[in-house]
Amino acid sequence: MQKSTNSDTSVETLNSTRQGTGAVQMRIKNANSHHDRLSQSKSMILTDVGKVTEPISRHRRNHSQHILKDVIPPLEQLMVEKEGYLQKAKIADGGKKLRKNWSTSWIVLSSRRIEFYKESKQQALSNMKTGHKPESVDLCGAHIEWAKEKSSRKNVFQITTVSGNEFLLQSDIDFIILDWFHAIKNAIDRLPKDSSCPSRNLELFKIQRSSSTELLSHYDSDIKEQKPEHRKSLMFRLHHSASDTSDKNRVKSRLKKFITRRPSLKTLQEKGLIKDQIFGSHLHKVCERENSTVPWFVKQCIEAVEKRGLDVDGIYRVSGNLATIQKLRFIVNQEEKLNLDDSQWEDIHVVTGALKMFFRELPEPLFPYSFFEQFVEAIKKQDNNTRIEAVKSLVQKLPPPNRDTMKVLFGHLTKIVAKASKNLMSTQSLGIVFGPTLLRAENETGNMAIHMVYQNQIAELMLSEYSKIFGSEED
C-alpha cells in the first residue's frame, strides 16, 4: 500500500496474525496539530479486501456528550424487576384525555420504567432483541394510586407520569394486582424526586443533542458544499435554532419548578383539603380516626345484614350490583351520613358486597402479613386441640384493631352459619368466600393453590371453633 506525499494524514496498516482472516485495521492520524485539537481520530475496519465500513461522522462534539455517558447508563443495562400479563388502558396522552380502551399487555418493569408489549411473551422478548421500541412509561416523578372510580372493573390502579400520560392497569386476581402495585410503587419511591433523575437527564440530553451536535454536523457538511453567499443564511438558522432551544429549556425549567413546589399529600391532608378515605386505608388508621378498634362501617353493615339478611339465600356468596356498591363506597369515603335502611340499599347483597370490598381493599389484610406463615403452620398441626390453641395464641398477639374486628366479623358469620338451612351458607362456603379476602401472603411465590387451601381452612376453623378461640360472643 502506497502513501500519498500530498496527504496530511498517514495510514498505519496492521495485518492480522491469524490465518484465514482478511481484517485490516487502519488508523487515520492528523499531522496538523491545530486541526487535531478540533477533530477526533476515527477507525475504519476492512472486513474484506476492498470493503471499507462507512466512517463515523467527524464533526466536533460538545462536552456534555462525554459527561452524560457517565450520568445515564444505557437502557440495555436496566434490570428487569417484574414481568407478566395485565389489562391496560391509556386514558390520557400529554394531559389530553383519551377514550378508555382495555387490552391485554405483556408488561415489563425495570428500575425506572415500564414497557408495554402487545405480543405474547416470546414475541415481546424477540422484539426486545431486534431493537423494537415498545410503548414505555418513565417512572421518574410518576404517581401511582388505586382508581376504583375510573372503571367498573375491580382491582384497578392508575399511573400518572410527569409528562401527563395516564395508564390504568387491572387484573381480576387480587394478589397479582397487589404484587404489581407494590412493585411499581417501590420502583417509583426509589427514584429521585428532583432534576437529578437519570430519566429526566436523558430527556435534556436528547434536546441538547438535537439542537447542538446534529445541527453542527449538518452545518459542517453543508458549509463545504454551498456557495459563500449562502453561509450567512446558515449562520442565521444556527443562531435561530439555538434561541429556540434556549426557550424550550426556559419553559422546561419553569414547569419543573412548578411541579416540585406542589404541596405534598401530607400538607393537603393537614389543611383538610384532602381527607383520608375509609376504603383503601390501613385498618389501624381508620380506627384511630374513629377512636375505636372496630370500624364504624363494618359495624353498620353487620347490623344491617343481621336485621334483614340472615335468611337470604346465598348471603355473602351472591354479588350485588357493582354500580350501587361503588355508590355506597363513594358516600362512605366522603363521610356523608349513611343510612343502610334507605330504599336505595334495599338489596342486601349490595351491603354484603361493600363489606367484602372494604376488607379486600385494605392495604394489609385483616390477618397481617407478618402473621401469615404462623397461621399456616398452626393450621398444619395434626391434633385438633393443638391446632385450636396455636390459632388462639396468634389471635391474642394481633394488634387490637385486627383482633377486635376479627372477633366481631367471625361472631357475625357464626350467625350466618346458624341459619344455613335457609341461606345455604355452610362453614365451608363462608371459608371459601372470606379466606382469600382476609388472609394472604405478602408475596406469592407460586404456591397460590396451596395457600388457598390453608386460607379456607383457617377461616373455617375460626368459625367452627369461634367460642374456643375468642371466648363467648358477649366477652
Swiss-Prot record:
GO cellular component, one term: cytoplasm
Keywords: Cytoplasm, GTPase activation, Membrane, Phosphoprotein
Annotated region (Disordered), positions in chain: 1-23
Domain PH, residue spans: 79-189
CDD domains: PH_ARHGAP9-like, RhoGAP_ARHGAP27_15_12_9
InterPro entries: PH-like_dom_sf, PH_domain, Rho-GAP, Rho_GTPase_activation_prot, RhoGAP_dom
Residue ranges occupied by any Rho-GAP domain in the UniProt entry: 281-470
Site (Arginine finger): R317
PROSITE patterns in alphabetical order: PH_DOMAIN, RHOGAP
Modified residues (Phosphoserine): S43, S103, S196, S199, S243
Main subcellular localisation: cytoplasm
Comp. bias (Polar residues): 1-22
One Gene Ontology biological process: small GTPase-mediated signal transduction
GO molecular function term, any single one: GTPase activator activity
Subcellular location: Cytoplasm; Membrane
Membrane-related topology note: Peripheral membrane protein
Protein origin, superkingdom: Eukaryota
Tissue expression per record: Expressed in lung, liver and lymphoid cells.
Job description of the protein: GTPase activator for the Rho-type GTPases by converting them to an inactive GDP-bound state. Has activity toward RAC1. Overexpression results in an increase in actin stress fibers and cell contraction.
Protein name: Rho GTPase-activating protein 15
Species this chain originates from: Homo sapiens
Gene giving rise to this polypeptide: ARHGAP15
